[in-house]
């Protein structure tokens, strides 16, 4: 296909939303008219299923749940008056609370305004807020945000170290839908301890975002925390950015949450259109399906040419991979579906792995994200060369990479935003939420549950239970044991490798036992009680 034919293909398949000023270009995905026609019946089904989902049908059959994240930015579409009111009340409560924090009506326990925000969450309770904070937070926000999004003790120490001397001005928000997810629970325990050691009342600094009736909600209300915000049963973590999970941190940082919601709502309206060529999310889903042969055979490399959007690929990893990575389809057939996502930002990645993308394995397609506005209005861009700015270089490198990849048989999609603001970020989030939902319908998987995550939690629980048994044995043990002897004593010879991992970790942290011998020869090690 020559350059003029490519230009015509670009014009034929370009989607533009005049209100949002967003472009979607799938012209550099190699597909034929026959492939498009073959997908039309599948899209007819996908549009119908999406319409039923928005009307309140059970769209998560494995858990018997409705799926209602689209209602969050269009409460009038919610199936009941109670849900509509709950959504509206939540947004108003978020705005009111943020205003009281900003103006000092709700002061820090030691007096004065809060200046720091410590956000505790995992998965969608962290990835969305992190992405939006990086993309939209002002240079001097009302509160500086810090994240704990793991159960890494060293990570806790580093974050709390940065807050040394500032805990008295720090607002702590704990986010957990179930209220007993281990990672945020562990962080809560450690942060509470830090407040006790500092002699600061934790409850006067604490906020919960959780499901109604959860263990976390009960604790927050019993201890008199500053506020409790809801996570609705019909909102999943990876689609929670327009719920209190995403709106509260944004509002506290001074981000316009009404604009974020408006951008998402406007994109939702566009992606509700039951016509393939006029629906930008359907165009993305079609591109993914064709390039990966409906089996996710090619990875999606996300390259936003904007520093503010550098965390978008991490956010998309969860949204896409947790939604689409399923072992079985809706009919119970084993399918092992998925779509791998990775990326960082342009032009950095051109000096990292784009070499392989251009000349190595052709097992991917690229999603370029272009932002037309180089800097904030009123800030001039100097010329770095005659008639060329740094932003011109950024744009030229995006175009050059797109062309170089296509010329070597590498496909790509390009999303163009007018600027990075709350409205466009809300629209971008909504675009991909819908694209994932439509693609899930095409391949017939449940996009709204995550059994693999639960399997990992159960396995971890079994490891910790075995560790408790090891500690109990070693407290009573007078002499040394080998690993096989320990396994026999615990009646679990089949778990000897797990035992090795456990005792190695316990020794490294100075707990209850010591290992004598060469750690590289596990069967020769002697396990001894640690001297008192």
Curated annotation (Swiss-Prot):
List the EC numbers from the record: 5.3.1.9
Superkingdom, natural source: Bacteria
InterPro entries found in the cross-reference section: G6P_Isomerase, Phosphoglucose_isomerase_CS, SIS_dom_sf, SIS_PGI_1, SIS_PGI_2
Does the entry feature the keyword Amino-acid biosynthesis, yes or no? no
A GO CC term attached to the entry:
cytosol
Provide the leader sequence positions.
none
Cellular compartment(s): Cytoplasm
Q: Which terms are listed as keywords in the entry?
A: Cytoplasm, Gluconeogenesis, Glycolysis, Isomerase
Kindly list the GO molecular function terms attached to this UniProt entry.
carbohydrate derivative binding; glucose-6-phosphate isomerase activity; monosaccharide binding
| Active-site residues per Swiss-Prot or TrEMBL entry | 322, 351, 457
Q: What does this protein do?
A: Catalyzes the reversible isomerization of glucose-6-phosphate to fructose-6-phosphate.
- What PANTHER family does this protein's entry cite? GLUCOSE-6-PHOSPHATE ISOMERASE (PTHR11469:SF1)
**What's the protein here called?**
Glucose-6-phosphate isomerase
- Tell me what organism the protein belongs to: Synechococcus sp. (strain JA-3-3Ab) (Cyanobacteria bacterium Yellowstone A-Prime)
Gene that codes for this? pgi
